């Protein structure tokens, strides 16, 4: 980025003005308005030209040096801004605020807005179905304060967290596009590995000033009403966020009305690895196809989709809330009531973000048109909601108000299909304001006046080729061919000479020009003033409007979950106080949708008698699917949704852990095995008897003995913790665990071979698997047949020559014992053993036997 320039004396007046503004924002790109373009200069220009793939050129000189520059048309800036924001850049918008006609020297310019990835609110720059969050964090390993703001909705939350692991897990859940941290934090902390990290001055996080600014924002004396007055660190982080939002928006933020105190104890905690492995809203490739959200989200509004995503990423342990949601879904399913609500909800649209843009005073005409349509649809929707007897739905209906006065105001003000922006006018209806109507009439009737004037002048002068016209540079004119110009009347005043023509003006035309041109500019100014006043009227009603938007978003989610329950054959889970997890005919909600054949449903039963299932079976047999479907069923239950199972009975869980699949962490310098062990360590340190743990192929990233030993010890530890555990493995030796751990049971995914090909049956059956079918899976994967044949030969030789052994028994506590290696990996017999096997001891003399013994000893 540009370095600050302190000596401005050698620069031109224009560049002096530029540097005075640029020096205040050295680390951000500056769009500097010059006429119809945003110009970008110096290092900003070099960077922007590369990022936007536009031409880098030069503009004159300043301080004796050519000025690198590039530019974009101001009316096309939105697309370029969107690209820069997606690349993580922040852009300072510097507009002309002075009048070029009256300015002496450079036109006055000001920074009117700073667009950053986390504070952008323009519809074109946002993903409509995902939250756009900015976060701030303060504190240290002992305790962190975290604040999260969605400026596009007004949602503002705070919480305090102990330890880096919990903080990083929460940041993974929130996934902010910008993260503000104190400038005095040490470098290379774990949080700095995230995208969009911005260091801010330590005083931005100061608790007392933060408390004061937050109370001013919410018009309260203190924060006791929000339940967060004791959260010193979180308040400091929230104050920094509020200051950053005001700095970037350069306006009041009336849509930020409250703080919500979140608590980890209220939620089912998922760490970052578990979120990725379960593919809640992003698949492992970074896309959105074949995720849980892609299956369960058929919301009618974008704000409903965003709320559902928040629910999926923050499952709850509050039984009161969960039961209220279940009852609501049951009510909406009764007589298919959701079918009547969903088309009406679609008419509401994304009023949550529209209201935020109104609060930021950058709402566009089409935003107001959509709000008008939404308010017009509210009365009918409210009537439909009165029939919903579930208590929670009744509360939502009470919160959903109608706004007949605002609806009438917008209906009177905004034309049916307004332009995208107010810049050129044409937004307000005729009849909304009499003064505006008069000015517009004068401007719009100019064409008829010119036609009439041309006809009169032709008749008066007898010059048939006379024309009356207008251009932006010279204004109105009367044009005559050069040959007829000498016949022009005396009151024709020469204005412009062209090749083959002369242009004139008359006192009458000049008088009309003054009125018409003045009327057009005054009409535009009047319309913009009326539009701003309309926004102020709407801002005064923001609190109830935002409450209505929140209620309708939740109604949309609940209606959506009712529709999904019907069409995906989901059933209501039952929460019980007895520790258990019993699922009958459970299905994987995502896999089921992509299969062309019927999904094989399976049961699961974990309780005080069985806390762990050791799952064996062939690759591709369905072990990972079975494990993941269990986690997704439990998660869906903890958002209040129905679940893909014939029945489900469970107690509340506190965490869901998954250790399924790994890859190298190249950026962090960690191997696949190191990633696997880090995830395993996290589980072993934090799992409780109320946690659900999925462990898939632990130990496969190292040698057989090491991997088996680690897997064995980890399984023992989880059994002792009494966590609900599904432990999938290819180490057949682990199937003896139930002999030492009474809470452990074996199950397997069955398969069979037919004509040397494997057939996966996908049924979960009691007991361990009989074999692994590895070669059959390799054949199915397309491994060349000659390789398969050779592998069978090796396998046969290994099985024939391996030393026989029994399945190992669990080591006694305190006595280290390496588990025996499985036959597949057994070492080849020593050649000495081959020699001994060939000996006919009955034909060997004692002397010959002694000689052979010495010879064999020398070969060992």
From Swiss-Prot:
ATP binds at residues 617-624. PROSITE patterns: DNA_MISMATCH_REPAIR_2. GO terms for biological process: mismatch repair. Residues 809-819 have a biased composition (Low complexity). The keyword DNA-binding applies. This protein is involved in the repair of mismatches in DNA. It is possible that it carries out the mismatch recognition step. This protein has a weak ATPase activity. One of its GO terms (molecular function) is mismatched DNA binding. HAMAP family: MutS. It comes from the Bacteria. InterPro entries: DNA_mismatch_repair_MutS, DNA_mismatch_repair_MutS-lik_N, DNA_mismatch_repair_MutS/MSH, DNA_mismatch_repair_MutS_C, DNA_mismatch_repair_MutS_clamp, DNA_mismatch_repair_MutS_core, DNA_mismatch_repair_MutS_N, DNA_mismatch_repair_MutS_sf. This is DNA mismatch repair protein MutS. Belongs to the DNA mismatch repair MutS family. The keyword Ribosomal protein does not apply. One of its GO terms (cellular component) is cytosol. Signal peptide: none annotated. Keywords: ATP-binding, DNA damage, DNA repair, DNA-binding, Nucleotide-binding. Residues 800-823 are annotated as: Disordered. It holds the Pfam family MutS_II.
